[in-house]
Amino acid sequence: MIALIQRVSQARVTVEGRTTGEIGAGLLALVCAERGDTEAQADRLLAKMLSYRVFSDADGKMNLPVQNMDGNGGAGGLLVVSQFTLAADTNSGTRPSFTPAASPEDGRRLYGYFVERARASHPDVQTGEFGAMMQVSLTNDGPVTFWLRVPPPGNA
């Protein structure tokens, strides 16, 4: 399972003109399930993402996670958006192959599971809409962007 996380000062996702999720300072996470992923990959990815230290401490060092981004226990927002294109195979030709991505059914199930677990673990979780054409706007703070991946079993 893959997450492209971006430290943002604000982010919003809209579908057909209506806002489905919006946060202030926090993380925008573009999330993709790969073929062979299970709930175990979702759990590991979420744990890593919530504890990944990308926010600055009092000394200006990237040392704080989204769950404690102000250094006093204050959590930032988390905007989770599905994006199957993160699993694209771009190694040959000029057109990406999406064979490595999970099927739409598995992707929907694992995205739903990921969001459910995120909401159980974090106070401010907003989302996009799985499978919809979305417009995502953000102000990347830094910019700070990281690619996190927990590979499917047997596929390092």
From Swiss-Prot:
Annotated Gene Ontology cellular component terms: cytoplasm
Keywords assigned: Cytoplasm, Hydrolase, RNA-binding, tRNA-binding
Group of enzyme by EC: hydrolase
Catalytic activity: glycyl-tRNA(Ala) + H2O = tRNA(Ala) + glycine + H(+); a D-aminoacyl-tRNA + H2O = a tRNA + a D-alpha-amino acid + H(+)
EC number: 3.1.1.96
GO molecular function, one term: Ser(Gly)-tRNA(Ala) hydrolase activity
Name assigned to this protein: D-aminoacyl-tRNA deacylase
Natural source organism: Cupriavidus pinatubonensis (strain JMP 134 / LMG 1197)
Gene (UniProt): dtd
